Amino acid sequence: MALAATRAAQLTTTGLESLGWTDAEAAQVAAHAHVARVFAVHRSDIEVRGPQGLDRIDRATAGGLDGVAVGDWLELTDGGGVARILERRNAITRKAAGEHVHRQVLSANVDRLLIVTSCNQEFSLRRLERYLVLACDCDVTPEIVLTKADLTDQVAGYADQAASLLAGVPVHAVDARSAEQVGALVASLRLGETLALIGSSGVGKSTLGNAIGAPNLETGAIRKLDDKGRHTTTVRAMFPLPSGALLIDNPGIRELQLTDCERGISRVFADVLSLAERCQFQDCQHGAEPGCAVREAIADGRLPARRLESLQDLRTEQARNAEILESKRQRARDIGHKYRKLNWSKRAKRGQ
Ligand SMILES: Nc1nc2c(ncn2[C@@H]2O[C@H](COP(=O)(O)OP(=O)(O)OP(=O)(O)O)[C@@H](O)[C@H]2O)c(=O)[nH]1
Ligand SMILES: [Mg+2]
Ligand SMILES: [Zn+2]
């Protein structure tokens, strides 16, 4: 509750707008409906905040909270129960994870997704591309925050590489521990705007959160050997900032695998795909085919070869994950079918 008290103290405006309420939510409920926004999701309860302040809802007794995510809006019953989760404007949904493919909503109703990466061994264009695809696929505007700018004299090089991945993507290079260096980011924050931080463990998401005004997020040292973090943040939670914006700090992501993100891919790889439209063959694989506009662009330096490789790798990975997902669904269908058959034969035996 100490955490909840700190958050309560930080909220300066009590109106729903300060919690991120928009016309999209207003259109879904009656004018005097009771609503609250989800600030943290725990195993047994959730923390919500509405015009009346902070509250905790027990998941078992409330019901109706399956799949609830930080950032969701809830319509409450007169008795304080949960009537329903309002339709989301958008959701950062992780559709696949390593061997176990599943869908997981990381943050809901997000205005700005800050993809955090560091100027050290963690920096990877491939990884950044994945995060950008995820953001674009979820219809959220991405921004890149390059932390640990103080640890390199190559900041401009890192920033240029990051910016080259998606036309117009803002890149903020900072020492995330410095309130002064994050000043421009803070100045851009608006009342009721929801920001979410995602990235690997140890890149400085919580450090950045603290610098932009979140109340004392826990941070932890990284391993010297490989710059990997130790998964310090374990709970997804949202915090009001002094600027009036809301910040969702996420735990570090181990490995971001993608499936079913074709829309995101088509946006992030628009450069490769628009060249591909000019290939002589419609089904060109951009290998040895004659008249390949993609190969031509690579040969004369207009397109970095790694962009094509990235696109092809992501497509292969998507296809593999889609297969795993489909075989899981099939297995679930088979089990459901067997179960129904068993129940049916039991009832038949009992003569029901
Ligand atoms: N030098 C330097 N250190 C930083 C910077 N940002 C973060 N750190 C340090 O990096 C370590 C990890 O920072 P965290 O904020 O805990 O990282 P995180 O992304 O929240 O990690 P998880 O919660 O594990 O996902 C801490 O020791 C921070 O002090 C930076 O810009 N410069
Ligand atoms: Mg953290
Ligand atoms: Zn081609």
PLM features per residue range, with description:
Residues 32-42:
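Structural detector for short beta-strands of small beta-barrel domains
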Residues 1-14, 32, 66-81, 85-112, ...:
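Helix-rich effector regions associated with P-loop NTPase G domains
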Residues 126-136, 141:
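Histidine-anchored nucleotide/phosphate-binding helix
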Residues 44-48:
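Short aromatic-glycine-enriched beta-strand elements
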Residues 54-70:
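Beta-strand/loop nucleic-acid-binding surfaces
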Residues 141, 148-203:
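Canonical P-loop GTPase G-domain recognition
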Residues 78-82, 121, 201:
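Short, charged beta-turn/beta-strand-edge "cap" motif at the junction between a beta-strand
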